[in-house]
Amino acid sequence: MNHIHEHLKLVPVDKIDLHETFEPLRLEKTKSSIEADDFIRHPILVTAMQHGRYMVIDGVHRYTSLKALGCKKVPVQEIHETQYSISTWQHKVPFGVWWETLQQEHRLPWTTETRQEAPFITMCHGDTEQYLYTKDLGEAHFQVWEKVVASYSGCCSVERIAQGTYPCLSQQDVLMKYQPLSYKEIEAVVHKGETVPAGVTRFNISGRCLNLQVPLALLKQDDDVEQLRNWKQFLADKFANMRCYTEKVYLVEQ
C-alpha cells in the first residue's frame, strides 16, 4: 500500500481545473454535508496535466464545496491512466415541455436513421429513438450537447444510469444517451478554459482511497510549513488503520 502514500497530496485550489460544470442543487447538498461533518470524507480524484496543474475526474462538487468553504488547499488522490476507463451516464428524465422544445429546435437535426457511426446523442421515448450525429452537427457538437443537457437539467429531476444498462421506462420517461469522449478530447476542452455538461462523463476508477476524513481546519491553515507537517502526521496516523480489499465488496452508501 506504499504507493497510495505518494498519490495523496494537498494541492492549492488555484492549481486545479474542472472538466465539467456542477449542478447547483447537488452542490448545496454536498457543501452542507461537508460543513456539518467538519471534514471532507473522500479525497478528490485528479489526473496530472501540464505545468503542475491537475484536472478533477471525480469530485467536482466536493472540490467546489471546499473552495466555497474557504479551504486554501484540497486533498487529492492522483490517478494514473492505467487506473481508469471513460464511459458516460445515461439520464432518465420525466417527459415534459423540454422534450417538445428540443423537437422544435431547427438547429437540431434529429433523425431516426441508423448509421454505421455511433450517434453523438440518442433520445429514447416510448418505442422511438432519435439521434444526433456528429457529422450533422459539425463543429457545434459541443454547444449542442450543452444545450440538450441544459434543456432538462435545470427543470427536472435527473436519474443517472450507467452506460450499457437498460432501465424500465414508462411513457412518462425519456432516456438520454451520450457518446463518451476520449481523455485527450476532455483535456483539450479544459485547456480552452471550457467544460463539458455536468453529470454525463463517467470515469470508472480502480484503487480509490475512501473515508480519509480530512479535517477542514487542516485545509484552511495559512502557514504552509505547519500545514504540510500536519498533513504528513495525519496520513501517518490514517495509514496505521488502512486496509486494501482486492476482492469484490458491496458498499451501502448512507
Swiss-Prot record:
Supply the InterPro entries for this chain: Chromosome_partition/occlusion, ParB/Sulfiredoxin_dom, ParB/Sulfiredoxin_sf, SbnI-like, SbnI-like_N, SerK/SbnI_C
Q: So where's the catalytic machinery, residue-wise?
A: 20
Q: In which pathway does it act?
A: Siderophore biosynthesis
Sorted UniProt keywords: ATP-binding, DNA-binding, Kinase, Nucleotide-binding, Transferase
Which Enzyme Commission numbers does its entry carry? 2.7.1.225
GO CC terms of this entry:
chromosome
**Amino-acid positions noted as binding ADP in the UniProt annotation, renumbered to this chain:** 33, 58-59, 61-62
Drop me one GO molecular function for this one: kinase activity
Q: Which CDD domains does its entry note?
A: SbnI_like_N (cd16388)
- Please list the residues that bind O-phospho-L-serine: 57, 59, 61, 98, 229
Catalyses: L-serine + ATP = O-phospho-L-serine + ADP + H(+)
Specify whether DNA-binding is a keyword of the entry.
Answer: yes
Q: Does the keyword Ligase apply?
A: no
| Reported consequences of knocking out the gene | Mutant is impaired for staphyloferrin B production.
User: What does the induction field say?
Assistant: Up-regulated under iron-deficient growth conditions. Repressed by Fur under iron-rich growth conditions.
Q: Name one GO biological process term.
A: chromosome segregation
Notes on activation and inhibition:
Binds heme and heme binding inhibits DNA binding.
Sorted alphabetically, which SMART domains does this protein's record hold?
Answer: ParB
Report the Pfam families cross-referenced here: ParBc
Which Gene3D superfamilies does the record match to this protein?
Conserved hypothetical protein from pyrococcus furiosus pfu- 392566-001, domain 2 (3.30.1760.10), Conserved hypothetical protein from pyrococcus furiosus pfu- 392566-001, ParB domain (3.90.1530.10)
Q: What class of enzyme is it?
A: transferase
Q: Cite the record's note on assembly.
A: Forms dimers and tetramers in solution. Predominantly forms dimers. Dimerization/oligomerization is not essential for kinase activity.
Function noted in UniProt: Free serine kinase that uses ATP to phosphorylate L-serine to yield O-phospho-L-serine and ADP. O-phospho-L-serine serves as a substrate for SbnA and is a precursor for staphyloferrin B biosynthesis. Is also a DNA-binding regulatory protein that senses heme to control gene expression for siderophore biosynthesis. Binds to DNA within the sbnC coding region and is required for expression of genes in the sbn operon from sbnD onward.
Protein name as it appears in the record: ATP-dependent L-serine kinase SbnI
Organism of derivation = Staphylococcus aureus (strain NCTC 8325 / PS 47)
